[in-house]
Regions:
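Helix-breaking motifs and short loop linkers at transmembrane-helix boundaries and internal kinks
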Residues: 39, 71, 92-98, 241, ...
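Helix-loop-helix hairpin linking two adjacent transmembrane segments in secondary transporters
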Residues: 136-183
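Juxtamembrane intracellular "pre-TM" segments in multi-pass secondary transporters
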Residues: 1-3, 184-215, 411
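C-terminal transmembrane helical hairpin of 12-TM major facilitator-type secondary transporters
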Residues: 275-322
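Conserved MFS/SLC helix-loop-helix module at the cytosolic interface between two early adjacent transmembrane helices
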Residues: 58-97
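A membrane-interface helix-boundary motif in multi-pass transporters
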Residues: 157-169, 361-381
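Cytoplasmic helix-loop-helix junction between adjacent transmembrane helices
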Residues: 102-143
Length: 415
């Protein structure tokens, strides 16, 4: 694959990540709106968030039965089209129950996209450039925060809460058209000798102790952040008195900072080592966790923005080396199944974090959120535990590429 085609592939995968991350991320800053529109509690809002991630976790487990049995491109397009349809159902929902069902459907189809994208990266990109590639794709998180979430919040404030989901649908349709051109045929894994049964493939994947440690590692890593993340906007509005317009500004500034930091962390992970970078970020993760949950009432907007930037640079930055570690911890023959199970572990970690965080916080008589700092304490404990588990994980530094690229690859530059 030429460098130009490789870059177009990374940008396409980043676009897919952007839309399905935006679909998930826009939920959390809209928390105050959903609690009012649907007349639900903070815990019920947490259930909306966790419903998506639980569904994504189940989807990841199911995907482990078929991810290595189809051409990566065809599977990616089918799942992405289904995700787009489910997001359209979210936009059309009118009640809490309808919206919950649509979120579950979006989780079932969207939950596999991240694992499949990481599998394609591991298939196509050599180990020595994998951290940089992960940084490009993972920067979609920052872009969704810089552009997608603020635009979504603006549309929700000026039109309705349905509008952000229509935005995701429109963008997804554009990405589908591009993906048809830029994603190559990847099917070398289909030609592996002595292919086992579906159940046998899963059993062979999970019977490797290194894989089990890796699944636990990634679950703990994402659970750290999701103890806190779903309730940030609710805390900002209820306790800090931040207006909707200022929340948009805070998200924009935070996303802009992580857009830069994601690329820097990806390059450093390749130069200094994925494990080394993850460890250093984890050692300081306590600072943003406690800072964002202990901000006092009356804090100036600039301080809130600084703390928010610190939080997402460090907390989300951990996911770049951790994703590269996971892609390299897989047995190459079982990479698709492994990454599906890895995605399931991440989704379940997010869901458990959102549910646990919702149980730790409550409201006082004045409607203020109390006990939010407990989510930070629990998150930091999980971060330390993930470091201990990481010591048990072995990575394959020279994982061979298993890519077969179609000779008639219709690269964008050929148009």
């Amino acid at each position: 694959m030429t460098p130009i085609r490789e870059r177009w592939l990374m940008l396409t995968l980043a676009g897919i990540q952007f839309t399905h991350i935006l679909d998930f991320m826009v939920m959390m800053p809209l928390g105050p709106q959903f609690t009012k529109v649907f007349s639900i509690s903070d815990a019920q809002f947490g259930a909306l968030v966790s419903a998506y991630t639980f569904a994504a976790g189940v989807s990841g487990l199911l995907a482990a039965t078929y991810l290595d049995r189809f051409d990566r491109k065809r599977l990616l397009l089918v799942l992405y089209c289904a995700f787009t349809t489910a997001t359209m159902a979210c936009a059309l929902s009118e009640t809490y129950v309808q919206f919950m069902g649509a979120r579950i459907a979006a989780g079932l189809f969207g939950g596999v996209l991240s694992a499949l994208s990481q599998t394609i990266i591991a298939d196509v990109i050599p180990f020595e450039r994998r951290g940089r590639a992960m940084g490009i794709v993972m920067s979609s998180f920052s872009v969704s925060t810089v552009a997608g979430v603020p635009i979504g919040l603006y549309l929700a404030a000026n039109l309705s809460w349905h509008a952000p989901f229509w935005l995701v649908v429109g963008l997804s349709l554009c990405v589908i058209a591009v993906a048809c051109v830029t994603v190559p045929k990847i099917d070398a894994h289909l030609h592996q000798p002595e292919r086992s049964s579906v159940v046998g493939g899963i059993l062979e994947t999970v019977k490797e102790t290194n894989h089990l440690w890796a699944f636990l590692f990634t679950g703990l890593s994402v659970m750290t952040g999701f103890m806190v993340i779903p309730y940030i906007t609710i805390y900002m509005e209820a306790n800090l008195g931040v207006s909707g317009d200022d929340i948009v500004l805070v998200y924009f500034v935070g996303g802009l900072a992580t857009l830069v930091s994601a690329r820097v962390i990806g390059v450093l992970a390749d130069k200094r080592g994925k494990v080394w970078i993850y460890q250093r970020l984890n050692w300081v993760v306590w600072l943003p966790l406690f800072a964002i949950t202990l901000l006092p009432n009356g804090s100036p907007l600039w301080l809130i923005a600084v703390v928010y930037v610190l939080f997402f640079v460090i907390v989300s930055g951990r996911m770049i080396p951790s994703s590269a570690i996971m892609a390299s911890a897989a047995n190459p023959k079982r990479r698709g199944t492994f990454m599906a199970l890895s995605g399931a572990s991440q989704s379940l970690g997010m869901a458990l974090g959102a549910v646990a965080g919702g149980l730790l916080i409550s409201r006082d008589a004045n409607g203020l959120v109390v006990g939010y700092w407990l989510t930070a304490a629990a998150g930091f404990a999980l971060a330390l535990l993930s470091l201990a588990v990481l010591n048990k994980v072995s990575v394959h530094a020279n994982t061979p590429s298993t890519t077969v690229v179609s000779p008639q690859f219709p690269g964008p530059e050929s148009g």
